[in-house]
Curated annotation (Swiss-Prot):
Organismal lineage: Bacteria, Pseudomonadati, Pseudomonadota, Gammaproteobacteria, Vibrionales
Gene: ppk
Enzyme Commission (EC) number: 2.7.4.1
Protein name: Polyphosphate kinase
Catalytic activities: [phosphate](n) + ATP = [phosphate](n+1) + ADP
InterPro entries tied to this protein: PLipase_D/transphosphatidylase, PP_kinase, PP_kinase_C_1, PP_kinase_middle, PP_kinase_middle_dom_sf, PPK_C_dom2, PPK_N_dom, PPK_N_dom_sf
Active-site residue numbers: H433 (phosphohistidine intermediate)
Function: Catalyzes the reversible transfer of the terminal phosphate of ATP to form a long-chain polyphosphate (polyP).
Cofactor: Mg(2+)
Enzyme's top EC category: transferase
């Protein structure tokens, strides 16, 4: 097989991942409302794809054109467009199918032409009272630069006013930042039906009431449209500008960045479409996509369940971790033994409670934390402010370049700085993606450090839907190295050595290679050798080549890859010892885990880093060993449960076919539910053991 056939283009692999999301919307075993929400997730993902992946390839084409390079990127862009258009068609078909399915459940999503007289009267009243104050049309005159005000990823209604042979055009922003997108119509007596109308359709219904009295026209029509801009921005690195100022300017650039996608209602007249493309400076490298009458489907992530409970997933309430029970405070519990939390199965309240306790504990001297993404109304962040008020030294490393969270992080930076928190904006040229917390307490004559090392963000909301591991430890070797990471962030030019943590960009590549090479050596020596890897994305060619080498040497490799995967499994003599699955279900799989067999003494690591060049070589990431045998086995058990999933697991192959793992006649295993049950049993057994220990202690007194 030629070398180029050993790597799948990451952009095409990403589209294959989003196809797996669309499979969830198509799966009739998924509750109906959840299927509709998966349409929203698919749409949100695709928006980001165009902002980032598509825009990056388009940028490469323009660079190659200037430099006289080859047209490889053009070919890739064409394949991306073809695949995206196919997925959009599948999406439209699924949407129509689900609308009919909802109607069978007596839930009706109606447009403005389907209202009866009573509903029509109510909707018009709602429009005048709630909607009209938020509607201001923008007339598209010849002298107006649409690019200066058209918002990225907002849905608009493009209005055509015709008077004889003359046309005027206008744009109306659908004000979903001010009003709900889904409006529930009042129930009518004697009718057991729920009726929902989109805000878009309320505006369509009342177009005449917006323009009447200001413009003369014979006909008035509205068509849906949306534009996606390039999400990249250039930062000025002049000395006189702080990173905060640079980022603020960068966000302003994004607001007026060039378009990469224009989605329009397919019934839009040709003359109107040409006019809009001219005004929006749409090039032939951009994606022009005809669609239905609704855009910004990402709002469907929050589609309301107005029907029966069974139309949604059964709740899986987060459980409390028994390792914290029986102690006066969280620090005593962590000092007694390492604690592993697994969100969303465990409650994130354990983390917010730890920081809350630290904020007023008289023994706590300092708190250090790095923030990548946090909730808008974060209790954890408010506790950091409380800690400063209580005289603690608080250092917060804020990553201002967390994509699409930049604005929120800038705002939190200002709030924290105003409160007296020492805010650091990180290392120039490198994102800080590690998930670290360090709390220092004065216990007697000693300073004792407590560390958190995780795979996911300190984000209360996403911790309810993202699966992640969080290690809490009072191991002073690990805690000292977490402290060293913060020192490296504050002074990246000072030499630092890590003996226990694996830290990007210092030693991640060499240490991961060392771990994989050890398995290769064991396989060549005739010993059992195995690697288990779980990441979101695997696209780094150096790491892929090392895995190919391990497979060729006889190392058995199992992988769970949620998103992009450039490695091609099943190639004879190259990757025939590699098995890859991907799991898409109600929770988003987010942990990064590496397990090496190590000649029968497994080594287990959790990490913040995906296996991408940027994460390994150009970001600050932390990979931590799990020392506690009990916790090592727990992680291995959880991974093993995922590898026997017969409901939500798909095989990753070179054709990107997304075939479900063969189900056969075996008992169905849905791994996320099985993991919940497994952890529930772990907590039950822990409480039972604690109760037995308490009984023994009482009887010995």
């Amino acid at each position: 097989m030629s070398a180029d056939k050993l790597y799948i283009d990451k952009e095409l692999s990403w589209l294959s991942f989003n196809e797996r999301v669309l499979q969830e919307a198509a799966d009739k075993t998924v509750p109906l409302i959840e299927r509709i929400r998966f349409l929203g997730i698919f749409s949100n993902n695709l928006d980001e794809f165009y902002k980032v992946r598509f825009a990056d390839v388009k940028r490469q084409i323009l660079i190659n054109r200037e430099r006289g390079g080859n047209d490889i990127s053009k070919h890739l862009l064409s394949r991306m467009q073809s695949k995206a258009l196919k997925l959009n068609q599948d999406f439209d078909n699924l949407y129509n199918e689900l609308i009919l399915e909802m109607a069978r459940r007596r839930i009706f999503l109606v447009n403005e032409t389907q209202l009866d007289e009573i509903q029509l009267k109510w909707v018009k009243k709602y429009f005048h009272k709630e909607v009209l104050p938020h509607v201001t049309p923008i007339m598209l005159r010849d002298d107006i630069d649409v690019m200066q005000f058209l918002k990225d990823e907002y849905a608009y209604i493009a209005v055509e006013m015709r008077s004889g042979d003359e046309f005027k055009y206008a744009l109306i922003e659908i004000p979903t930042d001010q009003l709900p997108r889904f409006v529930m119509l009042p129930e009518q007596k004697g009718k057991r039906r729920k009726t929902i109308i989109l805000l878009d359709n309320i505006i369509r219904l009342c177009l005449d009431e917006i323009f009447r009295g200001f413009y003369d026209y014979d006909t008035l029509n509205g068509y849906a449209m949306k534009m996606t801009r390039d999400a990249e921005y250039d930062l000025r690195h002049e000395v006189e500008y702080s990173l905060l100022e640079q980022m603020s300017e960068g966000l302003s650039q994004r607001l007026t960045a060039l378009p990469v996608r224009f989605v329009y209602e397919r019934e839009m007249p040709e003359a109107m479409l040409k006019f809009l493309c001219y005004k929006l400076k749409i090039s032939h490298y951009d994606s022009l996509i005809p669609g239905g009458r609704y855009h910004n489907f990402k709002d469907f992530i929050s589609f309301p369940n107005v029907g029966r409970d069974y139309l949604e997933n059964k709740p899986l309430p987060p459980m409390t971790c028994a390792d914290f029970e029986g102690y006066a405070n969280a620090f005593d519990a962590i000092r007694a033994q390492d604690i592993l939390l697994h969100y969303p199965y465990h409650s994130f309240e354990h983390m917010t409670e730890l920081v809350r306790q630290a904020s007023f504990d008289p023994k706590v001297v300092s708190i250090k934390i790095n923030i990548y993404r946090v909730a808008k109304d974060s209790k954890l962040m408010n506790s950091l402010v409380d800690a400063v008020h209580n005289g603690k030294r608080v250092v917060v490393v804020v990553e201002l370049q967390a994509r699409f969270d930049e604005e929120a992080n800038i705002e939190w930076s200002r709030i924290l700085t105003d409160a007296g928190v020492h805010v650091i904006f990180g290392v120039p040229g490198m994102k800080i993606h590690a998930k670290l917390l360090l709390i220092t307490r004065k216990e007697g004559d000693e300073f004792v450090r407590y560390a958190h090392i995780g795979t996911g963000n300190f984000h209360e909301r996403t911790a309810r839907i993202y699966t992640d591991f969080a290690l809490l430890t009072a191991n002073q070797e690990l805690a000292a190295e977490v402290r060293a990471v913060f020192g490296y962030i504050e002074n990246p030019f000072r030499p630092v050595k890590f003996n226990h943590l694996i830290v990007s960009p210092r030693n991640s590549r060499t240490q991961i290679y060392r771990l994989l090479d050890s398995e290769i050596a064991n396989a060549k020596a005739g010993k059992k050798a195995a690697i288990t890897l779980k990441v979101n994305n695997l696209v780094d060619k150096g790491l892929i080549n090392k895995l190919y080498g391990a497979s060729a040497a006889g190392v058995k490799i199992r992988m769970i890859i949620r998103g992009m995967c450039s490695l091609v499994p099943g190639v004879e003599g190259v990757s025939d010892n590699i098995e890859i699955i991907s799991i898409i279900d109600r929770f988003l799989e987010h942990p990064r885990v590496l397990v090496v067999h190590n000649d029968g003494n497994p080594q287990v690591f959790i990490s913040s880093a995906d296996w991408m060049e940027r994460n390994i070589d150009h970001r600050i990431e932390v990979m931590a060993p799990i020392r506690d045998e009990r916790l090592k086995q727990r992680i291995i058990d959880i991974l093993n449960i995922q590898f026997i999933d017969t409901v939500k697991a798909r095989r990753i192959d070179k054709e990107m076919s997304n075939q479900y793992v063969e189900r056969g006649n075996r008992r169905k295993v849905r791994s996320q539910i099985a993991i919940y049950d497994y952890l529930k049993n772990v907590e039950k057994q822990t409480r039972k053991a604690k109760g037995q220990q308490e009984t023994n202690d009482n009887s010995s007194q």
